[in-house]
Design a protein with these regions (language model features):
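Juxtamembrane helix-break-helix junctions at the cytosolic face
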Residues: 64-70, 300-310
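Long, contiguous internal "core" modules enriched in hydrophobic/ aromatic residues
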Residues: 7-27, 122-289, 302-306
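Hydrophobic/aromatic residues in alpha-helical transmembrane segments
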Residues: 54-58, 210, 249, 296
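Membrane-interface helix-loop junction between the first two transmembrane segments
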Residues: 30-43, 62-71, 221
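Alpha-helical transmembrane segments of multipass membrane proteins
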Residues: 28-29, 61, 183, 298
Length: 310
C-alpha cells in the first residue's frame, strides 16, 4: 500500500485565506474595542495550540515506547501536529511580553504576598518569562527529534529502534514535569492566591483528550480526501475511539476529585476558584464543560458501532 499525496485545490486555498483574513480583522477590531479580552483570547488560543502540538509529540513517544505498531498507518498526523509548537509558542511569548500586567499579581510590590513568599519569588516577571522561553525551546527541540527519528523508522526493519525508545522515554519525563509547571505559570497564576495539587494532571487530561480528538478528525478527513484511504481502517478508528472514551472518563475522574476535595474541605484559598464559576452566567459554562468533555463522549462512544462509524 502506498500513501497518496494530498493536493489542495485553489478553491480551498482561497477559502482558507478568506477565513484567515476575517479572523485577523476580528482580532484587530477586538484589540481596539476591548484590548484585555483580545489579548486574553489570543493567549488561550496559543496555549491550546501548544497543547495540541505537545500532544502530537506525546502520542509519538508513547506509541514508540509501547511498541504500538498499529499507529504506523496514521503516524504522519501526530508528526504534523508538532508543527504547531513554533508558531503557537511565538504567539504565546509575544502575549506574555506585551500583556504580562494582565496578571493580577503583576501590580503588587515586594512583600505583598505575605506568607506566600515562594509564590512571590516564583512569579517574578523575569523568572516567569525565562521559564516560558525554556519550556517552549525544550518542547520544540524534543518534538523535532522525535519526528526525525519517527520518519527514519520508515526505512528500518525494527519499527521501534532503541535510540527512538530512549529519546521517547526522556521526553516523557521532561513532558510530565514541564507541562505541569507551565500550566501553573500560565493558567493557574491568573489567580495566584488559589492553589490545587491536582492542576497539573487536570491539564494533562485535557491535553490528551484534545490530541486524540484532533487525530481522529484529521484521519477521517484525510481518509475521505484520499491520502489515508488505503491504510486507515475502521480498526484504527475503533482503537482511537476507545482511547478517547477512556481518557474522557479519566478527565471526569480528575475534575470530580478536584471539585469534591475542595468542596468538602471548604478552605477559602481553594474555594475561591469554583465559587465564581458556579454562579451567574458562568454556571451554565461549567455544566457545559462537563457535558462536552464527558457526558456526550461517554454515551456516544460507548457502543462499539459508534467508535467505528466516522
Amino acid at each position: 500500500m502506498k500513501l497518496k499525496q494530498l493536493s489542495v485545490s485553489p478553491d480551498f486555498k482561497r477559502k482558507l485565506m478568506i477565513a484567515t483574513g476575517v479572523g485577523a480583522a476580528v482580532l484587530a477590531i477586538t484589540a481596539v474595542v476591548s484590548p484585555d479580552r483580545a489579548w486574553g483570547n489570543l493567549f488561550v488560543v496559543a496555549y491550546y495550540l501548544i497543547t495540541l502540538g505537545l500532544g502530537g509529540a506525546l502520542f509519538i513517544a508513547l506509541t514508540t515506547v509501547c511498541g504500538a505498531g498499529w499507529s504506523t498507518a496514521f503516524r504522519r498526523v501526530p508528526e504534523a501536529m508538532t508543527g504547531l509548537l513554533p508558531v503557537a509558542g511565538v504567539i504565546l511569548l509575544s502575549v506574555l511580553a506585551l500583556r504580562l500586567p494582565q496578571y493580577g499579581w503583576h501590580h503588587h510590590g515586594t512583600g505583598d504576598a505575605g506568607t506566600f513568599w515562594f509564590k512571590e519569588f516564583w512569579l517574578q516577571p523575569s523568572f516567569l518569562a525565562a521559564r516560558a522561553v525554556g519550556y517552549i525551546v525544550l518542547w520544540i527541540a524534543f518534538a523535532r527529534r522525535l519526528v526525525r527519528k519517527s520518519r527514519t523508522q520508515d526505512q528500518q526493519v525494527d519499527p521501534c529502534p532503541a535510540p527512538s525508545i530512549r529519546t521517547s522515554i526522556v521526553f516523557l519525563f521532561v513532558f510530565a514535569f514541564t507541562i505541569s509547571l507551565a500550566g501553573v505559570d500560565w493558567i493557574m497564576a491568573l489567580e495566584p492566591m488559589w492553589f490545587s495539587t491536582m492542576w497539573g494532571v487536570y491539564q494533562f487530561s485535557g491535553l490528551i483528550m484534545g490530541t486524540l480528538a484532533t487525530i481522529i478528525i484529521s484521519c477521517i478527513v484525510l481518509r475521505r480526501l484520499g491520502p489515508l484511504s488505503e491504510v486507515f481502517r475502521d480498526e484504527h478508528l475503533h482503537d482511537l475511539g476507545k482511547l478517547l472514551l477512556g481518557f474522557s472518563c479519566f478527565w471526569m475522574y480528575i475534575w470530580f476529585s478536584q471539585y469534591m476535595l475542595i468542596w468538602y474541605a471548604n478552605i477559602p484559598e481553594e474555594t475561591s476558584y469554583f465559587i465564581p464559576r458556579t454562579q451567574g452566567a458562568w454556571g451554565p459554562v461549567l455544566i457545559g464543560n462537563i457535558v462536552l468533555n464527558w457526558v456526550i463522549p461517554f454515551f456516544v462512544l460507548l457502543p462499539r458501532p459508534c467508535k467505528r462509524n466516522e
